[in-house]
Amino acid sequence: MNEQLHNRTMAFAGILQAIAQVQHLARHGESDTDELAASLNTILVTDPESAADVYQDKAALHKGYQLVLNQLGDSSQKDVEITRYLVGILALERKLTRSNSGLAMLAERINQVNRQLHHFAITDEQVIANLASIYSDIISNLGPKIQISGNPLCLQRPLVQHKIRALLLAAMRSAVLWRQLGGKRRHLVFARKAIIDTAKKSLTL
């Protein structure tokens, strides 16, 4: 298996895994603690030696690979809403990587959260609120806001709002890595078969 394509597909799976949780939260108001932790932990790995260092929860990653197959494959599983969120994240990522001040501020704020983890778990409400505020303060202002669809009663709850923003930050982290590994939007069209084949093989690892 081509290692660069494998790593890139891993990062793309990370984006989709975070986005799918956003969708589920918006509709149902609840999240799987392990999946949430897996996505949020990726935000804090800022100097990885490999993509595998970022995605250490293999069960969560496998869900991401399945989402890659659903979204890029010729199946009825393709989800237009997931695609819309993906397009929004990739557009914001382009703006973030062009903003030196935004990147510097992001690094500093993530360091603050890392220090907080000496005392709290990654899924603690205060930590989630801080990750959400990073998204609101730095990412959200870069371009058009991503409009989240779902159950209005769920979306009104502050903890749900915080989790959604924290997960969008996790999706952004994976999008940055995907781009650093050479990912381009045109690959999702012209290299679709190679990405699907890589995701299928990765599911067996």
From Swiss-Prot:
One of its GO terms (cellular component) is plasma membrane. Signal peptide: none annotated. InterPro entries: HflD (IPR007451), HflD-like_sf (IPR035932). Keywords: Cell inner membrane, Cell membrane, Cytoplasm, Membrane. It is found in: Cytoplasm; Cell inner membrane. It is a peripheral membrane protein. It comes from the Bacteria. Coiled coil: none annotated. Pfam families: DUF489. NCBIfam families: PRK00218.1-2 (NF001246), PRK00218.1-4 (NF001248). Belongs to the HflD family. This is High frequency lysogenization protein HflD homolog.
